[in-house]
Amino acid sequence: MQDYNLGPDGYLDLIEGAKASVDIPVIASLNGVSPGGWAEYARLMEEAGADAIELNIYSIATEPTVSAVELEKGYVDLVRQIKRTVRVPVAVKLSPFFSAPANIALRLDDVGAGGLVLFNRFYQPDFDVESLEVVPRLTLSHPDELLLRLHWAAILTDHVEADLAITGGVHSATDVVKCILAGASVTMMASVLLQKGVQHAFSVLTDLRRWLEEHEYDSVRQMCGSMSRRSVPNPTAFERGNYMRVLSSYPLRAGHFNR
């Protein structure tokens, strides 16, 4: 992980080197909270060659005096400031923990966010019960995490102009298909590439092309959003009213509770 922790100047060099080495767009990730310094660093990323910037706002409100209104205003102000500083597209990596995700998504869309990334994965500390220390724990994503992202992509795609990206739980071509059907224009994967190697991406693309042919789609654009909340016959599948249907779908064995 030493190569990963490059520092600010090293990261700018990495962006410049990547831009010179590849023919695909280079999207730089910016971790920030306060508008001033981070907006300036966004400008330096653009100068280094970044084709777009993903703003990863990792803010944990540990102070009980900080209200949800203040926190959300900080997000919106930060995106507005960075949009005024750079000309390249800016995407925002969202947390799933907003009380009204659709509202904050719409507000970020209104101030110019070109993309919304669903969702950030916050790494939680663990307790070492022998040393009584708080220790970091890195856990790679699992396909089960995809369901929350599909849920909100299917809702948000009908309400925002920004492109949607899904990250967290994308491991296979089937996962990619689900993301696109929900309304995502972009799917991201990292954990499975760390586990299986970069060559796994080529297998996913091959399987995706096969699926498109078998289901007679000419392109991914044709299917994008075809299972959004507005597009499906039963929109309540994305709402609280679907709760009992989900529970009743679980197959209970005879005598399951008679023990």
Please report, for each region that a protein language model flagged, where it lies by residue:
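Alpha/beta enzyme core
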Residues: L6-E16, A20-I27, N31-I166, H171-T187, ...
